[in-house]
Structures are given as structure tokens and as C-alpha cells.
């Protein structure tokens, strides 16, 4: 257990990320403002009221303890961002999940700190050749000591998991770690739970929803040293994963396909933009021999040290200006901070107050937008 990270702070961390309208960006902002999850929890109801909410309750201690005990009953555990075995590459993400629920083989989980992690993603409606290639490539990469990560979707994801079951595989889930989706992959889910590892940042029992898949995709990209895309349409979740990988400085690989197959237009587009072409396992291995692999960060991008406190009046002014500057179109948080003549503590506090009150929301990334019910303060 890391120093200065007690069981009480772990439960507070779980409660904070499970509280209403507290996403990963808001979680890390709260840590910067208050230093610990416990202090942030104490401040949250007041922040919601100042943001315009008439009622706000944080996740209760009983609810967090119930989820904790249920995960242990299932044979799993929570991984917290300060834990030594928290996946190394995730530590460098500004929007990394602070808590991951895990189920599966303890040895496979330990592999995240000792093996090179590669993601393989692709089309759900993949061709037979694409599926066979995914399974074969995953198997060969596993023999070369790579740990294979994917999203347990039908098609390419499922075959990548099947190919790497014997050598080490990890499924990142869009719903709770106890929820099998799609149902047709129930047997594969059970096999991974026995031989590999299942990870999710979502609460137990959370059913997958369309809005949760991009969040899942960012974890797939962030947890890996590189992403291999096999068959992907121009508008697909696989390309979302690739875009996150580019943002995080990961290597991008793509398998070429027929120009007449819509399932290959996304991968061919990645190749045009400079992705490494993959026809066999040697193409992947040689790429890491030629290029320096990104170094996994062992420190967090923004340390959880409290920022300088500012007056309520200054925060109110920042909140009012923020409501006038934002719209339904997403705005980069960095651009918003730069446009406002207030200390960063005031701007960050205003951001949290408005989000937990339901007036603004974050996209999967570093953008915010105004919700329909938002109002301007008088």
C-alpha cells in the first residue's frame, strides 16, 4: 500500500468518482483544489449549490462499501491511481481513471508492470480474413511477450482476445466489470476472467451505453504502448481509439485493406497519415526496434497539491463570465482558461461548480459545453 494513501482515502476516492456528475476531469480538478478526495467530498455539496443546484448528495459511504465488498465477493479488487500495480502508461494521462475495477488472473494483472502492452482493435462486422488475421497476429505477438489489450466487442476485438488467451490478454469494458457485453461473448468473458484480466472504470452493474464507449476507447489507447487497427470504417470506434492514441503519443499501426471494402477505408486513411503498415508480426516488432517507445510515466501529470485559495466573489465572477463564453459547441478548457482574466484556481472552481450543478458537461477529452438548462446568473 502506498504511503499516505489509507483505506479511508481509497474509499473517499471511490465515493468521489461515483458521485453525481463527477467525471475524471472534475475528479482531478477537485484534487488540485483540495488535495485529498476526503476534503473534496466535504466541499462538493456547497460547490453544487453555488453552481445552481437545489439539491446534491455525494455517493454515500455505505454505497461505496457495498460496491467494494461486492467486487471482492466476485473475486476482484479495485486498483487505485497511487497503487504500485496501477497500469504504468495510464499514469501519464491527464484524464486517466482514478479507480479501475479488476477481475481475473492476478499474474496477468501483474503483467502490466513487466510486459509491453499493445492494443488490437477493429470492426465489429469484420471479414473472415480480418478475424483470422487478428487472432493470428495476437497469438504471435503474445509469443513475443506482448500483452494484448482490446475491448471485448464482437469481430476483431474478440478474435484478438482469443488469439492471446494463452499468452496474456486484457479486456477493457464499457460497462461494469461484472457485465458481459455483447452477450454472445459470455464464454470469452469467462475465459478471460480465468486466464487474463478484465478492467473497467465504471461502477458494478453499469450497463454499456453509447456514451461510455469513447471513454472505454481512451483507456484502451492510454493503457497501451501502441494501437493496431484491423478493418475500420471512416467513422468508427476504432478510429476514435486511434485518435486518442495519437493524442497520448502512442504508436499507430494499421493493416491495409481493399479500397472497395468500406471496412478498410479507415485503416487505409491511417496509413496515408503515416501509420505503420502491418502485414505480419515482424512489422510490429521491427517498428519498436526502429523507434523509441514512449516512456511510461511514474508521476502524475498534475500532482494533487492544493492550489492557492481564492475568494467566493472572484469565483462567482468567473462563473458568470464562463456561462457567457460557453455554448452548446465544445470549447477547449485550456482556451477557456486563457480567455478569462482570473486566477486558475477561480476558473477551475467555477468549472467544477457548474458541472456538478449540471449546467456544463465535459466531452471525452479536454472540452466543455453548455447544457440546455444552463442559465446566466444575475
Regions found by a protein language model. Give the residues of each.
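Glycine-biased, small-residue-rich flexible motifs in mid-sequence functional cores and linkers
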Residues: 1-7, 80-378
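Short, small/acidic-rich helices and loops at N termini and domain boundaries
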Residues: 1-85, 357-366, 370-378
